[in-house]
Amino acid sequence: HGKKPSAEFKKVHALVQKSHDECVKKVRIGMTGIEGDKLCRHIIEKAGYGKYFIHPTGHSLGMKIHEGPYISQIEKEKLKENNVFTIEPGIYLPDKFGVRIEDTVVLTKSGAKILTK
């Protein structure tokens, strides 16, 4: 609320951004939702914040705002060409702050294309 971001906030924000960018760069047709989720989650876990990433990495969009295949730790369905889904890793530190970075992507033969700005 008008304060400069703390060093911890900057660190967490950069980590979430790195996690997001890695998933956008590496997600591919034929991966399961589990594999897509791991692209984000392993970066956050490796940095020691895994227990603060408390939601799935993303969800598909269609007739409903949240639908499968999900980009989650339990989604076995494979991603297909032209699937539209979110990539939205986040870290939530209790009584401090939370950071989530979200984009909607379409999965093409060459990878994820960001649709949001």
Task: Tell what function each PLM region has.
Residues 1-117:
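Active-site neighborhoods and metal-handling regions in enzymes and metal-associated proteins
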